[in-house]
């Protein structure tokens, strides 16, 4: 491969490409989450009739996947480049393949496959038709058409593209370990992230206070419900994200039994559904401001 972009150059290339194709460039959301889908820029905006086109990098924390900075590709925190487009463009797959070309990956020279992998996130009431994108036998992207988010049907359909930046960069730079990636010229990925990987793994598996985390979950849940009662969508959703991350820490610590796990996930899911319903209702009160007049007319005609 001729063009070995740094991780930083990859991000800038994707930002420029998707911006030129109508996406707003958002910034990473400042609350811990397990995936870019859980950002309010995806979760909330995928529901309701308003159009939404956004792209952003999202650091995603998965405590159970931490490996003390010793595993070449299993990470406590990885980075996703998230693209969300509603309504989904007819040529979304072609746009994706075009973006790969700009990263130096010519689809005509590589084995690129869309492998069916329908997606769901039960804890957030989400599901959709999906594909894993495989590049020469390695998964690099998740491609999803949302059918349901927060228990609500998605009309119009939202398309989501989630690039796994570390995996994609490992392929482009031809390295075996993510820690050998060049983040920018002269600075390795490991020089930035190996210490936090070690420390967060040690905390998640050995040091975290289970009793405190259990109490925190209950407190965050209580506060989320208070916000829901006041129809405060975004504060409520922040506390739901805190509940989700706290659960993931408990799960990594082995503090949650199989039976308890289902109960915790149901508690998170019920709150997520409530927030989704309130969000759509509040946007409707505002007249769905991101809809243009033609879409208003079309909606009324239906």
From Swiss-Prot:
GO cellular component: cytosol
Group of enzyme by EC: ligase
An example molecular function term from Gene Ontology annotations: catalytic activity, acting on a protein
EC numbers on record: 6.1.1.14
Record's catalysed reaction(s): tRNA(Gly) + glycine + ATP = glycyl-tRNA(Gly) + AMP + diphosphate
PROSITE patterns: AA_TRNA_LIGASE_II_GLYAB
Compartments reported by the entry: Cytoplasm
Single GO BP term: glycyl-tRNA aminoacylation
Oligomer status and interactors: Tetramer of two alpha and two beta subunits.
Protein name: Glycine--tRNA ligase alpha subunit
Gene that encodes it: glyQ
């Amino acid at each position: 491969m001729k063009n070995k972009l740094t991780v930083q150059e990859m991000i800038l290339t994707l930002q420029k490409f998707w911006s030129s194709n109508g996406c707003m460039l958002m910034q990473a959301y400042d609350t811990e989450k397990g995936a870019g889908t859980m950002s309010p820029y995806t979760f909330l905006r995928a529901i309701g009739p308003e159009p939404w086109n956004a792209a952003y990098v999202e650091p995603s924390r998965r405590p159970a996947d931490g490996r003390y900075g010793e595993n070449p590709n299993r990470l406590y925190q990885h980075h996703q480049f998230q693209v969300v487009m509603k309504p989904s463009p007819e040529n979304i797959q072609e746009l994706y393949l075009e973006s790969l070309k700009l990263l130096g990956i010519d689809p005509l020279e590589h084995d690129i496959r869309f492998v069916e992998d329908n997606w769901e996130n039960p804890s957030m009431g989400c599901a959709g038709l999906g594909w894993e994108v495989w590049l020469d036998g390695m998964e690099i992207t998740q491609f999803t058409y949302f059918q349901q988010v927060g228990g609500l049907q998605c009309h119009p359909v939202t398309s989501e593209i989630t690039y796994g930046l570390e995996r994609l960069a490992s392929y482009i730079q031809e390295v075996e370990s993510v820690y050998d990636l060049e983040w920018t010229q002269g600075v390795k990925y490991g020089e930035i992230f190996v210490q936090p990987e070690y420390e967060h793994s040690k905390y998640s598996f050995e040091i975290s206070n289970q009793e405190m985390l259990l109490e925190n979950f209950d407190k965050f849940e209580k506060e989320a419900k208070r916000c829901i009662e006041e129809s405060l969508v975004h504060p409520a959703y922040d506390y739901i994200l805190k509940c989700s991350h706290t659960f993931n820490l408990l799960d990594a610590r082995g503090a949650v039994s199989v039976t308890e796990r289902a109960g915790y996930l149901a508690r998170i899911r019920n709150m997520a559904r409530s927030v989704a319903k309130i969000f759509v209702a509040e946007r409707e009160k505002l007249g769905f401001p991101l809809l243009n007049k033609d879409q208003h007319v079309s909606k009324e005609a239906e």
